[in-house]
């Protein structure tokens, strides 16, 4: 097994009487797509906030690239790209200004790749960020998260609420990043069909606890019913007892 990009050991986080993460342990080696799946409130975003160094571990430990993200934020964040569902970009900037602004923080910024992504995502350079649709903002956020070719890309529900075409664009960019450059992606979502399309490894989290964490093919093989291989949706129901999302939700 290759060196772990993320190493989490017995991580626990409580907010008052609520246990958001309960002795969570994960090891993510380099060069694959990891799907982190669970319902809203399951602990996905809290886990990601620890990885980003936004929360300090109350118990247990978090290491990213072998570093403590709280103690060494520059050493971690300079090698990490991040896109969230909120995608809070400065609305007063134009797209080209957003690119130039972000570029200044990353010596490894790849101008040619940024231009390629801009064309792929059909983003008008002179357009104000505030005038972009939700889907266009997601593409702009993904562009600036990818263009410096981070070793680790963390996506927290990046396509929630977006139309299928935009989701396909985002997933396509993830696949290219991994397939072409051998980088690592941690992809958080409650859309299990989406995760099945791109993930090599899947971690299911429920009520702050890890239910299962393994290669997707191993998870599906271990949940075979006769000759039929269950989908992730069906596996989640088998593990938890209720669907992740109600039909049509």
List where the protein language model places each region.
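C-terminal coupling/interaction segments
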Residues: 2, 224-249
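Conserved beta-strand-loop-alpha-helix hinge in the C-terminal portion
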Residues: 209-233
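Signal for well-folded cores of large energy- and translation-related assemblies
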Residues: 81, 175, 220, 236-241
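ABC transporter nucleotide-binding domains
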Residues: 3-8, 13-187, 192-193, 197-206, ...
